[in-house]
Amino acid sequence: MNKYIAGIIAGFIATIVMSLLLMFKSMMGLMPDFDIIAMIASKMGGSKAIALVAHFMIGSIGYGIGIASASGNNLHRNFVGLGIGIGFVGWLVMMVAVMPIMGKAMFGLDMPSGFMIPIATLMLHLVFGVVLGKAYTKLVHK
């Protein structure tokens, strides 16, 4: 399979997993002040549907092309480590750039959930990275 198509599919799979984890977080009442879809919607005219599409485009296309581009020419290896690294970089960008764009302090430390925001989002992005790398490995090895 073309490595870029594999990357986009892997990104889509990883975004589904992250979205489910975010949904479970909300259902359990954890960090109610941190709703990334609502935050994106607030910058895109208020539509949560459009924000969810944007979230999936970033996860699928952005991260998918990212892992495919970073994977190089040797596609006969395991890309989980690369996926974790990409997840970490995505988390760091979110914490130092996206949060301020959303009107929050870096790392979201001004939010009521405080230190839970960077810790929980780091864990989510690392899980995302594992799924991204594992799915990409499976797809490019077909």
Task: Go through each PLM region and give its residues.
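Juxtamembrane/disordered regions of integral membrane proteins
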Residues: 1-142
